[in-house]
């Protein structure tokens, strides 16, 4: 098996890796490959082998998912930080429990406070401002594991 990985500078200045496989395709684990943001080209060429729930959580798969909306797992997509536009267009399919933990969904959550799962939001590192405005709804156990919540925890230490 020959695996070649090239580094690509992503638009957001994050390093992304594009995976080129020269391998017997019967040896590929399509479940895990469907989760790999660097494998989108290979997955696009082998749509029949995609694990759609796994792909729905793949941040690199938004274009492919947009072309196959009928195959999306909406629970998994609701946790995908790059899927906010797709979720907004399919508002009635959002899983709000999963979305509450999604760091990319803060604006959507702020606009729909009545739908928030406060335990999952308490774990969301991007939700500190929203949590600060709703201290009475915080799940303090979950917040304790939130790496962005140290200031909020210390300010509310009993």
Model-derived features: positions:
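Compositionally biased low-complexity segments, especially N-terminal hydrophobic helices
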Residues: 2-7
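Alpha-helical scaffold segments
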Residues: 8-158
């Amino acid at each position: 098996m020959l695996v070649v990985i090239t580094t690509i500078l992503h638009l957001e200045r994050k390093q992304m890796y594009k995976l080129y496989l020269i391998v017997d395709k019967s040896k590929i684990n399509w479940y895990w490959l469907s989760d790999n943001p660097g494998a989108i080209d290979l997955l696009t060429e082998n749509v029949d082998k995609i694990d759609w729930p796994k792909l729905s959580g793949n941040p690199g798969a938004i274009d492919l998912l947009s072309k196959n909306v009928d195959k999306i797992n909406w629970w998994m997509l609701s946790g995908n930080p790059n899927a906010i536009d797709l979720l907004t267009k399919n508002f009635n399919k959002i899983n709000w429990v999963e979305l509450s933990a999604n760091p990319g969904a803060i604006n959507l959550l702020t606009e729909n406070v009545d739908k928030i799962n406060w335990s999952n939001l308490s774990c969301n590192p991007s939700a500190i401002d929203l949590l600060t405005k709703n201290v009475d709804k915080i799940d303090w156990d979950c917040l304790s594991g939130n790496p962005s919540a140290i200031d909020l925890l210390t300010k509310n230490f009993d």
